[in-house]
Design a protein with these regions (language model features):
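Conserved core architecture of multi-subunit DNA-directed RNA polymerases
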Residues: 1-926
Length: 926
């Protein structure tokens, strides 16, 4: 967008604007002054005219346009002193302003001699030269202004006061301008007063310019917020918070992969029209229909009494409903407010009665709830559950780089931090809020969940985490749109990205738990008896509860009385060995108890054991990624259903995240320090390579890194604190552990272009000589994060612009190109699945069943780089992967490359280890 200066005088003449001459806003009696800033004569009396009618103020002098004035001050700082009359100047033969006591001063001096002034360009200042070009390109009447435009009064704040009226900042600016102009009109003042008034007027014009500029610019400005931004009704912004894992079974989780948990307060905003309608119907059904005889709650007797209501329609109005909903959203203290009902011929305070039945998790009736008054929370919770039962929500995190930047979920309503199953009006509410009238108002907010929660498995697609990231939530209203949402949730594309990889992965804690469950046993581990083994083998997967897992693997204590009592050691370990003698899911032989439990919970219950059989291996992050890549492949081949994927994700996350605190160990005393043997080795290596270290040899630093890490891994191999690193859940020995406890290593000094070796680890602290070297490590991390973010963002826009029109041809299409790429298929060939190669003159599709035959071989692969179809990319050049995922607009997928680059730049902030690689020059040539 380009903005030019315009001739103010032309604007006044074309629009026939009237002049504002009085600084007085209101006359006596709050009547607008006829010549003032809110005049009915000048601006009219209708809303339309007061919204569209401009006016002007005659400045009675020449003043710089504020944008020009700012530019000149950056080139010639003393211009301000000329306008204020503090310094005198002459214009020499070259047109340059020179300081001279016998010269002239004031804004009129500059105006009269404007054509004589020559602004010198320089060879080393691009911005200065651009500003000079601007001054030369604009006319004199555009650079200087004699009139100030007054915007319509509709956009200026005005409020009446006892003294006549008070206005906002903008009206004060205009009022001051009129006063300065009246002084300049008469010019009945000393010269120094004239110059100072001119200076005040010029600065005031700049203040008005800055006022509007600040309203328009940057992220919160009107252009971005209202013109370029998108404001959606019934929408909310919320911080991403972790879901709660307290379910005894996976099927009892309130927040799972299919359902997001949205708090009552946000439902009231997101579904406002539906909630209002529900509450109105509730009052009609439960109050208005029984006003002659209604059972209500009497707090004095703690019983229900039958009463005649006194005109309840006049109380429970639309205004009452709006006030209740708005108060609930904005003021947590009112959430347990009781609903008082008007009683005929009585001043007693009686309340609408709530009656329901507590249920256990199997929905069997336990007891009647003691009669209590109904609260705002009761009504709005039931309303929220009812209005969202057939709706979906769309949760988005910006920026959206691909289709996984947002996701669709069904809705569960969350309320208080503690809930219970309740049956009310013949409907079961599994997570009904616990109403506690003993909670003080100031602590009420702590008893409610007021942020949206959703499955951890969506975080990778959103590129989000729990450090304050925010999402936008919108609930879909129409039946047609909800049907589309349901179809999207039940498609393969919801789980698999354009690369063909499984995108719904678990978090770091989940990986560590799965590793602990499945890690390799030691020769010293216990072998379970046949009776114990059969007990676990025959156990039904659906009977494995969290209570059972805690009893089996957990070390527990009773802290209910504030002290630790009844300490109980676990009965079994995850590495206890079981000998399966009768084939179980096709497996026969020795396994561990943890692996058996993992298979039963995750694969048996989800139905994936029919495809995978029994998985009897240690599962770290790499192995788990391989399993989930197989899941993606089988899904594309229709060997795994979408329902099985939902079950797999929920069961995996339930056991991985809820059991984490029971069986995993992240640190031990040994993994929080450097072993003495490693300290000895470090000193020996530093002494041995003293010369190379002083010379900053990165190869030697890399060698020392590897030696120290290798020695540490040997010493701590049996320490359970190493599970964090071995599992691949978080951190790495070669980066986090090394930098923290072992050896900082090579650091690039950008000033010298050479490496410096930092011998101390972070735990060792810093010597005085190492402070500058350590500072360079901070620079190496911060610079790529700051600059790289901007670069990758711009690259994403370029990629999107250049490739957005690229589409795939029809399935089976072939452009017939003879050109191919020579590709060596790696050990992990997932990136080349479903691509076409040419073998003996024929096309072969690299399906999961076939691609293994080509690992390690160089093949001739068809590529979009060589597609000769002018309208699209043909099927044979693109491969079958995109067709299996129904992605025809393939160019839109390319923007993910910018996201990859962004993540790589961000990663440098956390990992600045210098690595040495051998590069074959031939690999660099195409």
């Amino acid at each position: 967008m380009r903005i030019d200066l315009f001739d103010v005088k032309d604007f006044i003449e074309i629009n026939k604007l009237q002049e504002v001459t009085s600084p007085v806003l209101f006359q006596r009696g709050d009547i607008p002054h006829p010549d003032g800033l809110v005049s009915n004569r000048i601006f009219g009396t209708t809303v339309q005219s007061r919204k569209n009618t401009f006016a002007y103020i005659n400045l009675y002098g020449h003043f710089f346009h504020p944008h020009v004035y700012k530019a000149i001050k950056r080139m010639f700082r003393n211009m301000e002193k000329i306008i204020s009359g503090e310094q005198y100047y002459i214009i020499n033969n070259k047109g340059i302003l020179e300081l001279n006591e016998n010269g002239e001063t004031g804004i009129e001096f500059i105006y009269d001699n404007w054509e004589k002034i020559n602004w010198e360009k320089t060879s080393d200042s691009g911005m200065r030269n651009e500003r000079i070009d601007m001054l030369k390109n604009f006319k004199k009447d555009e650079i200087f202004m004699q009139y100030l435009i007054v915007i319509p009064p509709f956009y200026r704040d005005i409020k009446s006061t006892s003294s006549g009226g008070e206005t906002g900042e903008l009206n004060k600016f205009y009022t001051n301008a009129i006063r300065y102009a009246s002084l300049l009109k008469d010019r009945d003042m000393f010269s120094f007063q004239l110059y100072q008034t001119n200076s005040n007027m010029q600065n005031l014009i700049v203040d008005i310019y800055d006022y509007f500029k600040n309203k328009l610019e940057k992220k919160t400005g009107m252009l971005r917020k209202y013109l370029l931004g998108k404001n959606v009704d019934y929408c909310s912004r919320t911080v991403i918070t972790a879901p709660r894992f307290h379910a005894n079974k996976p099927t009892e989780m309130q927040t799972n992969f299919k359902y997001a948990s949205i708090p009552i307060s946000q439902i009231c905003s997101l579904c406002y029209p539906f909630v209002v309608k529900w509450v109105k119907d509730f009052f009609e059904r439960e109050i208005f229909s029984f006003k002659n005889s209604k059972l209500v709650y009497d707090p004095m007797t703690n019983k229900s009494v039958e009463c005649e209501l006194d005109n309840p329609e006049s109380i429970f109005t639309d205004k009452y409903i709006k006030k209740m909903i708005d108060g609930y959203v904005k003021d947590p203290e009112c959430r347990f407010n009781k609903i008082e009902v008007p009683i005929k011929n009585s001043n007693k305070k009686l309340f609408l009665k709530f009656g329901g039945r507590r249920l256990n998790q199997s929905k069997e009736e336990l007891s009647n709830i003691a009669y209590r008054p109904m609260t705002y929370t009761d009504i709005l919770y039931m309303a929220a559950v009812d209005v969202t039962k057939d709706k979906h929500c769309i949760i988005t995190r910006y920026p959206v780089n691909d289709e996984f930047g947002l996701f669709i979920n069904k809705i569960h309503v969350v309320s208080t931090t503690t809930t219970e199953p309740i049956m009310c009006n013949d409907k079961v509410y599994q997570w009904y809020p616990v109403i506690d009238f003993n909670v003080s108002p100031e602590k009420m907010a702590t008893k409610f969940i007021d942020s949206v929660q959703f499955s951890n498995s969506y975080l990778k697609g959103l590129t989000g985490d729990y450090d304050g990231d925010q999402t936008t939530v919108k609930i879909v209203f129409t039946q047609e749109a909800n049907a589309e949402c349901e179809a999207k949730m039940n498609s393969k594309q919801f789980f698999i990205n354009a690369k063909g990889s499984f995108i719904r992965v678990t978090s770091n804690e989940g990986i560590q738990t799965i590793y602990t469950l499945t890690k390799n046993p030691k020769t010293t581990d216990r072998v379970l008896s046949t009776a114990d083994a059969l007990q676990f083998i025959k156990m039904k997967p659906e009977n494995i509860t969290f209570e059972f897992l805690v009893d089996t693997f957990g070390n527990t204590v009773d802290i209910s009385n504030g002290v630790s009592t009844n300490a109980k050691k676990s009965n079994y370990n995850t590495t206890d060995i079981i000998d399966i003698k009768v084939p179980y899911n096709g497996f026969k032989g020795k396994t561990t108890l943890g692996r058996l439990i993992y298979n039963k919970i995750v694969f048996d219950q989800s139905g994936l054991s029919n495809v995978f059989g029994y998985i009897n291996k240690e599962i770290n992050d790499d192995v788990n990624s391989g399993i989930e890549q197989q899941i993606a492949n089988y899904t594309k081949e229709d060997k795994i259903t979408v329902d099985q994927l939902y079950n797999y994700i929920d069961y995996r996350d339930w056991v991985g995240l809820q059991l984490h605190a029971v069986i995993t160990t992240s640190f031990t005393s040994n993994t929080l320090k450097r072993p003495p043997e490693v300290t000895k080795l470090k000193n020996e290596l530093i002494k041995k390579y003293k010369k190379e270290i002083e010379e900053g040899d990165p190869n030697i630093a890399n060698l020392i890194d590897k030696e120290l890490v290798k020695k540490t891994e040997e010493i701590l191999d049996d320490d359970i604190g190493m599970d964090l690193y071995k599992s691949g859940a978080r951190g790495s020995m070669g980066n986090n552990f090394k930098n923290m406890y072992l050896f900082r290593g090579a650091v690039m000094n950008r000033s010298t272009g050479k490496y410096e070796i930092l011998e101390n680890s972070l735990l060792d602290g810093l010597d005085k000589k190492n402070i500058s070297v350590h500072s360079n490590t901070i620079l190496e991390g911060a610079y790529p994060k700051a600059v790289g973010t901007a670069d990758s963002g711009y690259l994403t826009k370029q990629i999107s612009s250049g490739l957005q029109t690229e589409v795939l041809g029809e399935y089976g299409s072939d452009c017939g190109t003879k050109k191919t790429l020579d590709i060596t298929i790696p050990k992990k060939p997932e990136d080349y699945l479903y691509r076409y190669i040419v073998e003996n003159g024929k096309l072969v599709c690299l399906t999961p069943d076939v691609i293994g035959n080509y690992v390690g071989k160089t093949v001739k692969m068809r590529s979009p780089m060589y597609c000769i179809d002018k309208k699209c990319i043909c099927n044979k050049c693109a491969g079958d992967n995109f067709y299996k995922l129904d992605k025809k607009n393939i160019g839109l997928v390319a923007v993910t490359m910018g996201g990859v680059l962004l993540n790589l730049n961000m990663k440098k902030f956390h990992n600045n280890v210098v690595k040495i690689q051998n590069i074959d020059v031939n690999d660099m040539l195409i």
